[in-house]
Swiss-Prot record:
Glycans are attached at residues 206, 209. The active site is at residues 47, 166. It comes from Mus musculus (Mouse). This is 1-acylglycerol-3-phosphate O-acyltransferase Pnpla3. The chain crosses the membrane at residues 43-63. Pathway: Phospholipid metabolism; Glycerolipid metabolism. Residues 10-179 form the PNPLA domain. The gene is Pnpla3. The lineage of its organism: Eukaryota, Metazoa, Chordata, Craniata, Vertebrata. Its main location: membrane. Pfam families: Patatin (PF01734).
Length: 413
């Protein structure tokens, strides 16, 4: 139960391209209950949630945040196979966007205020980073927090000489005190601010602190998190986040001033429209609200920013390339064009990788040796007992084994 005397924290779940949801939820809180954000002790974030927490604390304009998210979606959808295309480098997109948009004193603004969830590669443990000494450190930490193994690349980036990957691998909804932390997630589950669905299905799972209801709606959302849909569909997540945050405020009696009740309309119905037809308990990513009056309660600022971000800024060449006959032809030519594009992308990445190639190769050698050693210990128990005896003998003579772990700069190849 909400206690107005407490200072609350907020935790934003990692969600890939679904970060639009966090934008809508935060805007609702800032308009309807600004004291929650103004007096917040800490902002926690993982992956896209960490990106949102940093941009919010830095007071980036809403229009700029929407522009960054929409540009990232457009880049991901600009190729035939989307985010899997070799020309799409999500690490570079995130790094370039952060370097361009974040203020130079971002490390001073967010230190002690924002906790970024990372997963340390060496032991798989979760690490919360909250102190930064430069803008580059903030960018490195955010790139590490967004690095999905294999999907984002083969070699993990580094932060302060240590390799890290997506914080969602170990803790996707980081909290220090669950009783005083408001959790925000775009997935159907049991978090404070998240989509709700009326259904007889009560099954849900908890994966690295992320609560997921077992429903087709979450399956679609998980797919959209890695393979974004059209910009209009992704933009609608802002409205979903805004309404879910409003429902949370209403249920806990936090709203400033009298507000119109939305409790009957904010819960997604058991049957939603898909292509004009009712489909069981399926809740698609495209929102299905039954009360048109809901839209009157939405923030004019959000509606304006979203409409502006969705506007088509493509030139005539892009419009021609998006014509159905041209797209069909491009798919037919894909078996021939993809190998050539892959070779070009590989050469380009190799050239940009050259400054870090020595450190990264050393790390790959160390990682390979660790994997081989663990496999050997699992397959040959005698080796495990012999290694234990050797360690005991070394400790007895005052020696402490310390495996060599070369560290390098961020790579993300």
């Amino acid at each position: 139960m909400y206690d107005p005397e407490r200072r609350w924290s907020l935790s934003f779940a990692g969600c890939g391209f679904l970060g639009f949801y966090h934008v809508g939820a935060t805007l609702c809180l800032s308009e309807r209950a600004p004291h929650l954000l103004r007096d917040a002790r800490t902002f926690f974030g993982c992956s896209a949630g960490a990106l949102h927490a940093v941009t919010f604390v830095c007071s980036l304009p809403l229009g700029r945040i929407m522009e960054i998210l929409m540009d990232l979606v457009r880049k991901a959808r600009s190729r035939n196979i989307g985010t899997l295309h070799p020309f799409f480098n999500i690490n570079k997109c995130i790094r370039d966007g952060l370097q361009e948009s974040l203020p130079d004193n971002v490390h001073q603004v967010i230190s002690g205020k924002v906790h970024i969830s990372l997963t340390r590669v060496s032991d798989g443990e979760n690490v919360l980073v909250s102190e930064f000494h430069s803008k580059d450190e903030v960018v490195d930490a955010l790139v590490c927090s967004c690095f999905i193994p294999l999907f984002s690349g083969l070699i993990p980036p580094s932060f302060r000489g240590e390799r890290y990957v997506d914080g969602g691998v170990s803790d996707n909804v980081p909290v220090l005190d669950a009783k005083t932390t408001i959790t925000v997630s775009p997935f159907y589950g049991e978090h404070d601010i998240c989509p709700k669905v009326k259904s007889t299905n009560f099954f849900h799972v908890n994966i690295t602190n992320l609560s997921l209801r077992l429903c087709t709606g979450n399956l679609q959302l998980l797919t959209r998190a890695l393979f974004p849909s059209d910009v209009k569909v992704m933009g609608e997540l802002c409205y979903q986040g805004y309404l879910d945050a409003f429902r949370f405020l209403e249920e806990n009696g936090i709203c400033n001033g009298p507000q119109r009740s939305l409790s009957l309309s904010l819960v997604a119905p058991e049957a939603c429209l898909e292509n004009g037809k009712l489909v069981g308990d399926k809740v698609p990513v495209s929102l299905c609200f039954t009360d048109e009056n809901i839209w009157e309660t939405l923030s004019p600022e959000l509606s304006t920013a979203l409409s502006e971000a969705i506007k088509d800024r493509e030139g005539y060449l892009s419009k021609v390339c998006n014509l159905l006959p041209v797209r069909i032809l491009s798919y037919i030519m894909l078996p021939c064009s993809l190998p050539v594009e892959s070779a070009i992308a590989a050469v380009h990445r190799l050239v940009t990788w050259l400054p870090d190639i020595q450190d990264d190769i050393q790390w790959l050698q160390w990682a390979t040796s660790q994997v081989c050693a663990r496999m050997t210990m699992c397959l040959l128990p005698s080796t495990r007992s012999r290694a234990s005896k050797d360690d005991h003998r070394m400790l007895k003579h005052g020696h402490h084994p310390s495996p060599h772990k070369p560290q390098g700069n961020s790579a993300g190849l």
